[in-house]
A protein has these predicted regions:
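Pepsin/retropepsin-fold aspartyl endopeptidases
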Residues: 1-147
Length: 147
């Protein structure tokens, strides 16, 4: 018996919105979103503690970043300040949007003919929005009014 539609209906009644995902060639779950007014593909990463954007992408798009003085993922960590990340118009609540250099990861992806990662939704957003991931239908459910 297929319970996926019942799950979706229950979550909808409880104030969740459904966002459809796709899989990349290496299995990453991918969402379509916006960073301010720019369309951007976003990888859902349950292992990432924070939501982030690739530093080279920020620089190529003229997105202002500020060095936090912290080090992570092999380099400096930057913040995007008041940048706004949205999924189908829903503002994604985070602990702040950070930027890191993901060039080593992206070089490996590109060498395999796979698009580079531009942004990642991490555990901060998933926690605030009480995320439910339905792997059977590749759907992400986020509570519209975050906790």
């Amino acid at each position: 018996m297929d319970y996926t539609s019942e799950i979706a209906e229950l979550l909808s009644r409880r104030g969740f919105r459904r966002f459809m995902m796709s899989r990349t060639q290496v299995g990453h779950l991918l969402l379509a979103g916006h960073l301010d007014d720019r369309p951007i593909d976003i990888v859902l990463d349950t292992g990432a503690s924070k939501t982030l954007v690739e530093l080279t992408y920020c620089r190529s798009e003229g997105i202002a970043v500020t060095d936090t003085g912290q080090v992570g993922h092999g380099g400096s960590v930057y913040t995007l300040g008041d940048a706004r990340l949205t999924l189908e118009g829903l503002p994604v609540r985070t602990d702040g949007i950070f930027a890191i250099d993901m060039s080593s990861t992206n070089q490996r992806l590109v060498s395999k003919g796979i698009d580079p990662i531009r942004a990642v939704i991490g555990q901060d957003a998933l926690r605030y929005h009480q995320a439910v991931i339905d792997y059977a239908t590749l759907a992400l459910f986020l509570k519209e009014q975050p906790a």
